[in-house]
Amino acid sequence: MTKTIALLGATGSIGRQTLEVAGELGLRVAALTANTQVDLLEQQARQYMPRLAVLYDENAALALKKRLRGTGIEVMAGEEGLLAAAAMTEADTVVTAVMGSVGLRPTLAAIQKGKRIALANKETLVCAGELVMDAAEKYGAEIVPVDSEHSAVFQCLQGCRDRGEVRRILLTCSGGPFYGKTFDELEHMTAADALRHPNWHMGPKITVDSATLMNKGLEIIEAMRLYRLPVEQVQAVIHRQSIVHSLVEFRDGALLAQLGTPDMKLPIRYALTYPYRTESPDKPLDLLTCGALTFAEPDERAFPCLRLARYAAAVGGTACAILNGANEAAVGLFLRGEIGFNDISRRVERALERVPVQYQPSLADILEADKAARHAAL
């Protein structure tokens, strides 16, 4: 069980909830990192007194350094700071809750130190899954997923002695705020519309990804990497209630599912306490009041991002890094009101058509594909 954490992405939704859980469990916090939020990271640093605080933005880091003068907390900036936080000796678990491909190098740095990785940064496995999983095997690092769906699958597989027994993984999906709409109806949806998720409270980027179903597409790729399965054995299913977090179907026809309230603190707690379970102060799921549970097939005509993700997964190589980089760029444009909702999938498809795919890529190849895809999506 975890005793000390380094938290990458402390000011985001997952980061804030991780600190709540860490406080409940009595864990020590050795490092906190964020992008630009000086005020919140200062508040967190004063409360949890880590040895290291990192802001990716250099000007923000300078401001934080002045504010934390006299506290004994070291302040660093940029990727150098993220790498230092990920590799610090006293942290036995690194929680990677940063958004986007910026989490890739720090995750690899933590893996090379043989640490447990509580992985909430799906882009790491999407872009460089084979590199990451091979490195984890080489250095004896343990990867425990924090995404609710992958945590559910991870839990369902605990009694599985042979992955050959798995017939398929079923990742559940709420359908987002636009479930039931056609592609034409989605043409004029705004960022404000997309940010109204029916069940989960998340950051803006992942909420938009949930609205386009790209989030589920990325999770399909992540599951392929985590569990070493072909794309044909990973499937998305619409489950509006977000009670069943995912399912595993075995060769004998048995279907195991993990159920719980739509609360990210549950998978965060599990990732930090695995292989043990601890008492939670949160209200558990009441099956007698949760009502009917429904399941349906996703509409890939209305939500082409899911189809594009499956395509990239089948192509392999750097195609998934191209998919992810283009999507990050397109979602940023959408959130700033510069493009429409359906333009996100159009920009991603354009990048997949224009950027050459490299097979058996190095880390440098992956990062170059990410950069080229972002440019192609603009």
Q: Over which residues does each language-model region extend?
A:
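Catalytic, metal-anchored helix/loop core of enzyme active sites in primary metabolism
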Residues: 1-378
